Amino acid sequence: DSEFAELKIRGKIFKLPILKASIGEDVINISRVSAEADCFTYDPGFMSTASCQSTITYIDGDKGILRHRGYDIKDLAEKSDFLEVAYLLIYGELPSSEQYNNFTKQVAHHSLVNERLHYLFQTFCSSSHPMAIMLAAVGSLSAFYPDLLNCKEADYKLTAIRMIAKIPTIAAMSYKYSIGQPFIYPDNSLDFTENFLHMMFATPCTKYKVNPIIKNALNKIFILHADHEQNASTSTVRIAGSSGANPFACISTGIASLWGPAHGGANEAVINMLKEIGSSENIPKYIAKAKDKNDPFRLIGFGHRVYKNYDPRAAVLKETCKEVLKELGQLENNPLLQIAIELEAIALKDEYFIERKLYPNVDFYSGIIYKAMGIPSQMFTVLFAIARTIGWMAQWKEMHGDPEQKISRPR
């Protein structure tokens, strides 16, 4: 039997259908409130609003659970590779061996970008942020694929593959241009993560030998950042897509949203915070500053809009961070890691943070890993965008298959 919630306005009662979730909280359908009750609901920041139906990602923030298509994020990070997870998000199931091989071949086939795109990079000044370059380059792909300006259902999967394939190439090109080095073409004999590292760090006169520990760590980071429900950038992609905008334009809006320091830029801010703290001896002083409402200092990398428990992605990255630094001989003498570990230990025992459920999030350790790999801080958000592209494309594809989809129009 159908269940209803009752809303009483000015003495009149309105019945609102309660929709049963397959997992997690049920929702109240308020879509008819404005038409029937002559008023609107008000929810700043969409704190209590579900904007769509989705079967891609599930989060239980109280229990610290994150699942993609029913698979636990820790299992995916430990047992899968990034393109397996990409296939899972886009198609709904993990691939068979044959499906995986075909998928990886298709991604490799589309990894090149049009040579004319190289000229776009030359229009930027040498000090341009890689995210600014990437944002423009991804949007410009619309000019190279005019046949996709009005996507049909048959094009959705090919579009997703093209985007997944070209994003790391554009990301590496953005980095190379920002440091004045020539672009490095993709090498289709390498897997996805190896190829990105190759394009980042090889030069025409020096080959780059991929360290398997580094590759595996980056693979985990990509998986952990692949999708995360209807966050700011994903919602931006969906809103842009709801108007019928082409997929390249939609992804560029996601990149723009991700660039914000409260979203994708947080791991860079964590590095700056750890540098500011400077040493373990200063941690108590900065803990006190974080508690002081009148002090502008804030502990970055703690707390999350959804998680009221330990972020499961942070748990994986903490161990991955130790593996990378051990491989690079930095485990015992990396000052940022030592500060981070001690800061976490102190915060997790402090009643102030416990009461407010402020636990380390995914940004707390990822920046330390990137820095140890030799990836500069201005590239941190670029790498986030590479990973999140598969989530954006899966959400974009799902949105176009939703019979209830309408153009987004908040009041």
UniProtKB/Swiss-Prot annotation:
BP GO terms, sorted: tricarboxylic acid cycle
Pathway given in the UniProt record: Carbohydrate metabolism; tricarboxylic acid cycle; isocitrate from oxaloacetate: step 1/2
GO molecular function: citrate (Si)-synthase activity
Enzyme Commission code(s) on record: 2.3.3.16
Cellular compartments per GO CC: cytoplasm
Active-site residue numbers: 304, 363
Keywords (A to Z) from UniProt: Transferase, Tricarboxylic acid cycle
Reactions the enzyme catalyzes: oxaloacetate + acetyl-CoA + H2O = citrate + CoA + H(+)
Keyword Ribosomal protein part of the UniProt annotation: no
Group of enzyme by EC: transferase
Family designation: Belongs to the citrate synthase family.
Note from the entry: Citrate synthase is found in nearly all cells capable of oxidative metabolism.
Protein name as it appears in the record: Citrate synthase
Name of the coding gene: gltA
